Amino acid sequence: MEIDTLLEALKDFDKKVKKEASTVLDQFLCHIAKTGETLVSWSQFKTYFVFKLEKVMEDFHASAPEQRGPANPNVESIPFEEMKERILKIVNEYNGIPFTIQRLCELLTEPKRNYTGTEKFLRGVEKNVMVVSCIYPTSEKNGCSGVNRMNGVMLSGNTSAFTERKVNGPGTPRPLNRQKHSMSSSLATNGLPDSTENKDTNTPQGHSKTTSDASASGIGGPLGSSVKNKHLDDEEDEGMEEEEHEVKRLKFSQDGNEDEEDEDDVDEQVVETPRSTLSKSPSDKSEDPESPSSMLQEGSEEEEEESKHEGSAENSEDQEPSSTQPECPVADSRETFTEREVPCGSDDSSEEPSDMDQSEQRAPAGVASSPELREGEEPSEVSSSSTDDNASGPTSSSSSIDSPTEGDTGSGALDLESAEEPMEQD
């Protein structure tokens, strides 16, 4: 429908003295009833709308008979003239197009479509005219840019404060100062911008979006590095914990070894055998057993004195046939001594007699270079010198060195007797 013809028809209707219905204006009301689009302002078609409303109510009252039967006691019965005046008064007080204009135009174009009685028809019209909200014609049709809608109602506003937006509804307004958000540009339902003003607002927003993306990417770098550093710190902490566990295990193993050594020392003190010889090399084993009498003398001083007094007489007797005495009895006596001394010995203790025989054979050959052999020979020399002093004649140190067999036999007898005494005491 062309707006120019509509405006000419409205002007002609206003100029007429006698008001008559117009075909062009009736088509205009039918167009509003179908589409709801008001192509012109309220002031332009208000006169024809009031004329058409009054004529329809009169025609309906003339064509439709009065209500038959008794009236409903719950419904107030209002005369036709009073109801008509009330409706016309409300419509004349409008400052804009009511938002129920489409329904009102339907009632004006087809009054008997839903109603048969005059009273019900008037009540339906009254319900649709008793509204407050108003709408205004769209900017696309009448060329007016200062048109806005809020909740389906057209409102006159300033384009500097609001722009038309069709995202959440047919025309939801949006203030222009909200440019911080990247999605603040007004878009239609099809994704296209509404006007050139919105295109201008999109350019700074695009820059802000790129800057925000760049800042986000810049922030992501240190965050990733911090995460890597955190993983490295966690790995270092795990490595330190593993080292601490290993150190603890080593400490526990060392403590266990020390405890075992302490137990072995206690067993050696009880059995009176030097278990320390087991941990030494075989050469040390062959050298240490030469001086069992020295270990016994350090263990008990009283037993040494008794053994010296008792063995002095025997040594004086044994010194004369020492040159012809074989070494077999000495070996036998040492074997019995070791058997008594270590009844629960290991394989190393069983091998000691043979090592002792070899050491006795090496000792008189003049091997006195190592300090261990000297320490082992000193007690035997001291014992032989003490026995010679207690006997009839004094002997020199050269005689004791020249006759090693005599010292060995005497020390063997001395050791045998001194070993028998502690066993008897135990």
Swiss-Prot record:
Domain of life: Eukaryota
The entry's keywords: Phosphoprotein
Basic and acidic residues bias locations: 332-342
GO CC aspect terms: cytoplasm; nucleus; protein phosphatase 4 complex
Stretches with biased composition (Acidic residues): 234-244, 256-270, 348-358, 417-426
Modified residues (Phosphoserine): 370
Region (Disordered): 161-426
Annotated Low complexity bias: 381-408
Classification via InterPro entries: PPP4R2
Spans traversing the lipid bilayer: none
UniProt keyword annotation of Phosphoprotein present: yes
This protein's record includes keyword Phosphoprotein: yes
Family recorded in the similarity comment: Belongs to the PPP4R2 family.
UniProt name for this protein: Serine/threonine-protein phosphatase 4 regulatory subunit 2-B
Species of provenance: Danio rerio (Zebrafish)
Lineage, uppermost ranks: Eukaryota, Metazoa, Chordata, Craniata, Vertebrata
